[in-house]
A protein has these predicted regions:
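Short helix-boundary/capping micro-motifs
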Residues: 24-42
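Hydrophobic hinge/microswitch elements
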Residues: 111, 142-155, 160-161, 211-271
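Beta-alpha-beta core module
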Residues: 166-173, 177, 199, 239-289
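Flexible hinge/capping segments at coil-to-helix
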Residues: 166-205
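Secondary-structure junction motif
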Residues: 204-225, 293-303, 307-319
Length: 320
């Protein structure tokens, strides 16, 4: 790149910095008015920057509708570029702070509901012991919503069970955990070493709704049952199914992740499922593919990987 071209690029960045930030805010908010409210500026100022950017690019970036706005194809291309620029800037800031001997930063995490308890709490505790100035935002989210949140830059990392492969997502860590039936300690099946789905359906059963990965893992075994079965309750809430099982209302299905305290306090029993063999559920940690990771985020991912390995080892030591 020539000196003249470098000067032109720097000037373009200076001119478009505000427009790109406003564009990203509008994309996230879904409307110019809401973006202006979040930025604490006038709607007209935001609209002016968007129009300027559209004029420079020579194409509309948003389709305007009565209920809000949506990205056009050109807008989606710009959104990918803006996301890379902002995340690279975040990494540069983190690296500079690292050179000063101070790790700071903010990490946004989306995790499936059952993981936002013991597992994530343990990871955040270990992270803050090593980087006291880091801040964390942790949001429970369904497995199907997590890839989009990571790819859109709404969160830095996602933690989910059984995600299908995605070219734009990179799996940076994974733990393999056995699916089991959870029930009250006084349940007739609680003392067994393992149970089949057919045995579980001799009693009231609580089943996950379709959007939960547990349901997808159970589907092949359910299809092989030689009788029609009907759960007494269906729910998309991991916490609700856990609570119902603890109260003796029925049998639910989960991995041991997040059940540590319940099992230790003898409020729940986890009995491994046998469907001609174990049913395994992979808990993966994901970031956007190709992203250069800030030092603080990289550290958080290493801690998550360590925590998952430790839990795999602990589960393997439980008698089958």
């Amino acid at each position: 790149m020539t000196a003249q071209r470098r000067a032109e690029v720097i000037e373009d960045l200076r001119i478009h910095a505000a427009a790109l930030l406003y564009f990203d805010a509008v994309r996230r908010a879904g409307s110019i008015r809401e973006a202006a409210r979040r930025l604490n500026v006038a709607s007209s100022a935001v609209n002016r920057q968007i129009l300027k950017l559209e004029a420079e690019i020579g194409a509309p970036l948003f389709d305007r509708f009565p209920d809000g706005i949506r990205l056009t194809s050109a807008g989606e291309a710009i959104a990918r570029h803006v996301l890379v620029v902002l995340q690279d800037l975040d990494r540069a800031r983190s690296d500079i702070e690292g050179l000063k001997g101070a790790r700071i930063g903010h990490i946004a995490i989306a995790a499936v509901e059952g993981v936002c308890g013991a597992l994530l709490a343990a990871v955040i505790r270990r992270l803050r012991e090593r980087t006291p100035r880091v801040t964390v935002a942790a949001e429970p989210m369904g497995s199907l919503a997590i890839p989009k949140a990571v790819l859109d830059g709404d969160v830095d990392l996602g933690i989910a069970f059984a995600l299908p492969r995605h070219a734009e997502l990179r799996q940076v860590a994974v733990g393999r955990f056995r699916l089991g039936a959870i029930m009250a300690p006084d349940h007739p099946l609680a003392s067994r070493a393992k149970v089949s789905l057919s045995m579980c359906f001799d009693y009231p059963v609580i089943m996950p709704m379709g959007e939960l990965s547990i349901g997808q893992l159970l589907a092949p075994a359910l299809a092989r049952l030689s009788r029609n079965v009907r759960p007494i309750i269906r729910s998309s809430s991991i916490e609700l199914m856990r609570e119902l099982a603890e109260r003796g209302i029925g049998i639910a299905f989960q991995t041991r992740v997040g059940l540590d305290k319940h099992i230790a306090e003898k409020r729940l029993v986890h009995v491994p499922l046998d469907a001609g063999g174990p049913i395994w559920s992979d808990l993966g940690v994901y970031v956007r593919a190709g992203r250069a990771l800030p030092a603080t985020l990289d550290l958080a991912l290493h801690i998550l990987a360590e925590e998952l390995r430790e839990r795999e080892i602990a589960e393997a030591s439980v008698p089958a």
